[in-house]
Amino acid sequence: MKWHNIGRAVLTGLVGVGLALGASAQTLTSNATGTHDGFYYSFWKDSGDASFGLKAGGRYTSHWTKSTNNWVGGKGWETGSIDRVVHYSGTFGVDDSQNSYLALYGWTRNPLIEYYVIESYGSYNPANCEGGTDYGSFQSDGATYNVRRCQRVQQPSIDGTQTFYQYFSVRTPKKGFGAISGTITFANHVKFWASKGLKLGTPDYQVLATEGYQSRGSSDITVSEDAASANAGK
């Protein structure tokens, strides 16, 4: 997968779509965004049989086969926070031969920035964009994260077709497959990015996303945040 497919996938599903659902478990097979049991969610696919299950609280499930060209979905927060400490656990049902990733994903405005904290990926590292700039690495949550900036020129965004930057923090070593869990102290990423001149703007949504591109797999992920970071956002 080329790195730009990830952004295009999420954007197409998130812009201009709204759907509020109750707290009962549901399985989505059509593109939608909204809130469910206290969490924001997004689901988009361009074809095929990918499905997205809304479960209690911050839990979601997904399943897809190669009949789906590209899909992405996740649960999180309608308004992102630079101070959010995100916890996730569950299963990431892919392997090194499958083109998929698991990441904290979000947007800001003024400046318009698309960002990723990549926790695990399969056959393709989403930060491997052509013409990108590397900004070194830093330590957070028991791992090293490599930082890279990519530019999108006149491509879809939360504000329509725009030119904007993407920031990537890619975990090394990446998390494995199967049972998976971790913590993302997002403030550490924001601080390092800022030290390199990579500024964020006003937060838009922020989700813990699963993505698949011309691959097959499944996920069952529960996302939550520290109480302190939740209160800070109020």
What spans do the regions from the language model cover?
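N-terminal signal peptide c-region/cleavage motif recognized by signal peptidases
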Residues: A20-G22
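Long, compositionally biased interface segments
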Residues: G178-K234
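Extracellular-facing segments of soluble proteins and assemblies that are Gly/Ser/Thr-biased and enriched
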Residues: G73-Q139
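An exposed acidic His-Trp-rich patch
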Residues: N110-K175
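Bacterial N-terminal signal peptides
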Residues: V10-G18
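N-terminal segment immediately downstream of the Sec signal-peptide cleavage site
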Residues: Q26-E78
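Bacterial N-terminal signal peptides that target proteins for export
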Residues: M1-L11
